[in-house]
Amino acid sequence: MTAKWEKQEGNKGVLTFEVSAEEFEQALDQAFKKVSKDVQIPGFRKGKIPRGIFEKRFGVEALYQDAVDIVLPSAYTKAVEEADIFPIAQPSVDIDQIERGKELIFTAEVEVKPEVKLGEYKGLEVEEESVEVTDEDVEKEIENVRERHAELIVKEEEAIENGDTAVIDFEGFQDGVAFEGGKGENHSLEIGSGQFIPGFEEQLIGKKAGEETEVTVTFPEEYHAEDLAGKEAVFNVKINEVKAKELPELDDEFAKDVDEEVESLDELKKKKRNELETNKKQEVENKKREELIQKASDNVEVDIPEAMVDTEVNQMVREFEQQLQMQGMTLEMYAQFSGQDEDALKEQMREDAAKRVKTNLTLEAISEAEGIKPSEEDIKAELEKMASMYGAEVDQLVQMLGGNTETLENDLKVKAAIDFLAENSKTK
């Protein structure tokens, strides 16, 4: 294999590579075996035509395309390895020379991963944030626990107050015409939750069970349904039932009911304080790392190829699809609900995708500059962790990955680069 790489403008270049005459001849042999199975010539059984007769009738050139299809994928892969380049998109390949008995010569226009010129990334400064948890924080968390364990008690005659839950039937009209998605029955609505359109919940305050009322609202300009965005609508609302929250008494029994690991309210407060401190430390550390990554990325000079952004956008769409599936939705259902098709979604994601690409390129460049490489032990530990998550053996997981742990190794390099940024940062 002879490969030659000529870099051109931007992130593109031309890769010239050859396949030996011997390899080309072997590919022609394979091509003949494939093609001859379907060739019918008088005097010969189908698939039994001699090679010489075939070539005399059709010419050896009839085998060229199939031979190229056979030899090109592996030849291109070897050429990429020899030239030590990292393609980011499918190449445009031309045949420069194809003749039996001679080398097969290809040229490929290839777009490659861009060069990254690192700026300052060591000793970056970040604000030091407090991880202190106050008594007020603990009391607020305890109140949240009380809220989660509250009982809903039916209010017979009392009017709706903020924080109550109203069970309602409703139907919305625009210019006197009912609109799609604007109707519901026995819907439980917590007043003050912000679950409905702004202004809707407030207009129910003071009403009682059994009453019917009209609620007039204006849909937000950014509302997902374009035909309703910014428009006024009137809802006919029937209040079927009103429920009020009854919070449990704040005592030792409450503490034991909500957490079997504690024996008193003081123990529950202590445990919640420890949990809050752990979470606060993690939040502060995560924020610090995100800030360091952003600063290092801002200091980088790189020409981001559109092909890499396209790939990242597609990945983001797949991730979004998985999130929708967890909610029992499909991308098509989301498009109908939001009025935003896949192309519009991709365009919306494009800016974030470009940022993600730049961030990854930055972290990869830092890992290269600092010689950061995961050890065999690191890779094994990560595989064991992943296998445990999927309930599989490590060997099974490696098989699922097609025997290729390159993506996993790259992820570990990126994580290690983030650790490096954090370990070499300063606080101010």
Swiss-Prot record:
Domain (PPIase FKBP-type): residue spans on this chain: 163-248
Catalytic activity: [protein]-peptidylproline (omega=180) = [protein]-peptidylproline (omega=0)
Enzyme Commission number(s): 5.2.1.8
Cellular compartment(s): Cytoplasm
One GO cellular component, as annotated: cytoplasm
Any Pfam family hit: Trigger_C
Family, as annotated: Belongs to the FKBP-type PPIase family. Tig subfamily.
Function according to Swiss-Prot or TrEMBL: Involved in protein export. Acts as a chaperone by maintaining the newly synthesized protein in an open conformation. Functions as a peptidyl-prolyl cis-trans isomerase.
Record protein name field: Trigger factor
Organism of origin: Oceanobacillus iheyensis (strain DSM 14371 / CIP 107618 / JCM 11309 / KCTC 3954 / HTE831)
Gene name of the encoded protein: tig
